[in-house]
Amino acid sequence: MSFRVTQEDILSIPADAAALGLEMTMRIAAGPSCQRIADAGGEALRAAVRRVRFIPLGSAAEAELSALPFRHLLLTGEPRWLNGKCNELLVLRHCYESVFSLAESLGCKSLVMPFLSALYFHFPKEGAVHIALTQAEKAGLDVTFVADTPELLALSGQPYRRPEIVSYVGYYGDHALFELDNGLFARVDLRPELTEVSVIPYFEACYRTGNNPLQPLLPDAEVARLRRIYEESD
């Protein structure tokens, strides 16, 4: 529906639900907004988190708690940035998808949360903010993001620089692969009726052009078409 970014106190923002990130140890993430809620919830919040027991990375769950100014408190397992080759970007996107889906299933119309993984999990901040805003645009509720630093607030208002294609790697099956300038790879669907693009951290040798003598090379015009699909994608 809509989103906005603010630096207000997260507890002062009217919303049906709030969402927090959790570390793999099920501790509340160390960001200022997360800790603000943790301090307000006190031992009751810590007990509610323990009752949840475990949340897989990228998933979300509700913590049953009435001591906060929200009807629902949602938790999600935040990913850490390791080396960019462990599906970190995909997992972070799943965090938002899971949180928004759970909030909608609970009947929420509004949600407040910090930017996940953007401060203490070594994520590239620009990418973390971009994923948050892109997923919020698709959500069926009003989302308020609390930017815990001036840098995050500034990034939320800047155009996102899409990673540029460095080279065409090859294709396998229904997908072509392009190397990006951030060390990741863009996989683009070859089928004309589809315009699907996904970013992946690695590629298998089968994608390398010329490694399969039975696989014909793609015409330059087709490679150019696939490149345009990537450049025009979200």
Residues covered by each model-derived region:
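Glycine-/small-residue-enriched capping loops at alpha/beta junctions
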Residues: 1-106
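Mixed-charge, Lys/Arg-enriched low-complexity segments
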Residues: 199-234
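Short loop/edge segments at beta-strand edges and connector loops
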Residues: 5-7, 198-201
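A short, sequence-level motif marking secondary-structure junctions
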Residues: 173, 189-196, 222
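Short amphipathic beta-strand/extended segments with alternating polar/hydrophobic composition
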Residues: 185-192, 217
